[in-house]
Amino acid sequence: MCYVIGVKVPKKQTIKVGDAPIELDPIDIPVQSGFSYNPWPVLYNEDKTLRPGLMHWELIPNWIRNQKELVESRKKYTTLNIKSEGIFTNKVAQAVVHTNRCLVLASHFFEWQEVEKQKYPHCIQIENTPLFYIAGV
């Protein structure tokens, strides 16, 4: 599960997703942990048009009514990432998986490898591809 991610768009540019041109402003977030709960750049659907924007990185269950409940729920479980294998049966994701999808912008992410009880971060990126997308809800 990638909880640590980065994105870099060095200058204003137009990207294409399918046939849709999308204007992106410069972005430079070298490393961010999902556990910081900061906004993250995404492409989201508004009136059948993909638009860039910042969104909260965490799927908040629909039964959470306020900030205090959210903080308490984080102590019990995390909803930063939802595995695709169970997305249609996951109680938290079921309510939004068909209607609230987005593309999470990324240039790289980090996975950890354990060697002799020591964990080491590995930066994973796509060669010759400065920007890619991860499915999000």
What are these regions (language model features)?
Residues 1-137:
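Short linear sequence motif anchored by a di-proline
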